Every structure is written in C-alpha cells, then in structure tokens.
Amino acid sequence: MSRIGNKVITLPAGVEVSQEGTVVTVKGPKGTLSREIASQISMSVEGTEVAFTRESDDNKTKALHGTTRANVANMVEGVSEGFTKTLKLVGVGYRAAKSGSKLTLSVGYSHPVDFEDREDLTVEVPDALTVKVSGISKQRVGDLAAEIRAVRSPEPYKGKGIRYEGEVVRRKEGKTGK
C-alpha cells in the first residue's frame, strides 16, 4: 500500500490541474508545468483536491502510485511558491559573479568556469560566496544546482569547495607526521 500515493493534494488558490490523456498540466501564478504520468495511475480532480488511484497492486504500480503523486505535488508547489537552492563557496579566493546572463565561478582553477542562464531558471549572486538557483521545476533547479556544485565538490581534508547551504562535509584527518 502506498501511503504517499493515497494522500490527497490540496490545491492552493489560483492553481489549476488538468489532464489530457496521460499528460498532467498544472497552471499557477508563477507559470505552467506539464508531465506525463504512467497509464496505470488515474487522477481525479474534485474541487480543490486531487486524488490518485492505481489499477493493480503489483510492486511496480505501487511504486509509480507514490512517485506520480509526489511529482504532481511538487508541480503544484512549484507553480504556486517556487523552489530555491542556495550554494555556498568555501575556500580562499573562491568567488562567484553574475554579469548579464552569465554566472562566472572562480574556484581555484587556472580559468574561470562559466554557466549560461537557463530559460526557466533564475540564478542570483547576493554576495561573492553565495549562489541562489530558483525556478518552478524542482527537478530543473536541483539539476542546475548539482551542475554548479560538481565544478568543485567539497573535499574532506580542508572542506574547500562548493556546497549546498546546510550541507555538512565530513572531515578526514590528514597524514600523521613523525
């Protein structure tokens, strides 16, 4: 039994959910998102509540039931509130700068690393050591944040690198000297 799949999604004011075949579309004040759902899962919209049911109880369908409900709930949250990931740069001389539609990271390489803006995402640099990625799609925000973090992942000896806000880096002990 999928406990998450059986939960009902309550729609906030100004958000509409519609379904055409297997494509679910969510419209809200921040934009519109669409996603294809599995054919084994059916969706019903009654007033301000969205419910999901599955046609069989095999393991794959149970997994799809909860996943589909979670994906649509994230779409509803995205078009109503949006998602934000904050990254921190830790290290001597590490800095980020935004010029026009380009994010430039100086993180200890012999060259700066550039990222172009994505059409549906917003990248902000409130200060030289902080980068904020925001948008309506949780998946796209997380993907861009992961790409930025992968430029210089935190290393375990000094803790230098790009990390998510609140991320704890497990530190290792260095070599023992004689």
Curated annotation (Swiss-Prot):
What Pfam families does the annotation carry? Ribosomal_L6 (PF00347)
- Could you identify this protein by its name? Large ribosomal subunit protein uL6
Per the entry, what this protein does is: This protein binds to the 23S rRNA, and is important in its secondary structure. It is located near the subunit interface in the base of the L7/L12 stalk, and near the tRNA binding site of the peptidyltransferase center.
UniProt xrefs under HAMAP family = Ribosomal_uL6_B
Q: What PANTHER family does the record point to?
A: 60S/50S RIBOSOMAL PROTEIN L6/L9 (PTHR11655), LARGE RIBOSOMAL SUBUNIT PROTEIN UL6M (PTHR11655:SF14)
Molecular function GO terms recorded: rRNA binding; structural constituent of ribosome
Q: Which family does it belong to?
A: Belongs to the universal ribosomal protein uL6 family.
- Per UniProt, which keywords does this protein have? Ribonucleoprotein, Ribosomal protein, RNA-binding, rRNA-binding
Q: How does it assemble?
A: Part of the 50S ribosomal subunit.
A single cellular component GO annotation: cytosolic large ribosomal subunit
Give me the gene this protein comes from.
rplF
Any single biological process term in GO: cytoplasmic translation
Q: Which domain of life is it from?
A: Bacteria
